[in-house]
Amino acid sequence: MELSVVVPTLNGRDSLGATLDALAERAPGAEVVVANGPSTDGTTGMVRGRDDVDVLVKVSDRTLNVARNAGIEAATGDVVALVGHDLVVGEGWKEALRDALAGDAAVTTGPARSRVSGGATAEEPERRRIAGRSVTYFEGGNVAFERAALDALDGFDEYLETGGARDTAHRLAALDYPVAWRSGMSARREYGTDGGRTAAEWGRKYRSLAYRLVKNYGVRPTVVRRILSHAGSEAVANAREVVRGDSVPTAWLGSGRRVVGGIATGVSDGLVSRARDRTPRRNPHGISDRHDRAVARYDWR
């Protein structure tokens, strides 16, 4: 197995160093590719000063899927792993990855543990059955693909600002590529998030949800029901925050407008993308769609 590890980053200097240190220790011999968005925190200088990075690709786009695809393009391994810049791979990570791909799986993932006051918590693999298709979701910052699977997918869909990993899970299911789960392929997240969303982020979330469901399955009752179910449950939860005094009615209404607008845009754009790529890979905005992602490239191989 020739392993390449792609680390997409944007203003992640504070945590990226620990990510790279762990890869050097726990995945020795792996080709390491850092795909850096338009960072303003000195990430490029920090990476150039290290001797354990093989390729640094700079991209001008802030979208995570663009950085992922730029890194995948630069990688040469027959297995390509994606590791988030805020994750530290654990002991035995590489061995668990190799073991999973030695079987029938073409993709493998594992838990991403978060530091919380009560200790470390890990997500279990999430599986759903949608329109007769069994979908296994994966952790986008802790996943490895055989090159053949990535080629069949044409990488990630660059239309998506968020939800790129979930979209890819739907497309893997359509292409009949199994996804393995290995608890030993674990990574640890040292930095948490605030858990909140702005009105604009609500819009992006629901544009992504509507887009990927419509693109992958078309407009059908199952799709409509899932979109409305998600939106309805979160509308009720946010309304309760207003009642408790944790939010204000204007914020609730503003978020609601963004959600409705995001759904409308996502449905429309999903239909266009579905028509543009009628193959099971459903990726009109993949790696092969453009070759101008990188604005600079440093190759020390």
List where the protein language model places each region.
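Cell-envelope/extracellular polymer assembly enzymes that use nucleotide-activated donors
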Residues: E2-S4, E31, D167
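Short, well-formed alpha-helical segments that are part of the catalytic scaffolds
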Residues: L10-R26
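Acidic helix N-cap motif at the loop->helix transition within catalytic regions
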Residues: D14-A18, D41-G49, G92
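Glycine-rich, basic loop-to-helix element that forms the pyrophosphate-binding segment
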Residues: G45, K58-A75, A96
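Short aromatic/hydrophobic "clamp" motif used to bind/position activated sugar donors
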Residues: V80
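Conserved donor NDP-sugar-binding/catalytic core segment of glycosyltransferases
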Residues: V88-A120
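A short, conserved alpha-helix in the catalytic core of glycosyltransferases
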Residues: N142-F145, A149-D154, Y159-S186
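Non-catalytic, C-terminal membrane-associated alpha-helical segments of glycosyltransferases
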Residues: E201-S208, G218-R301
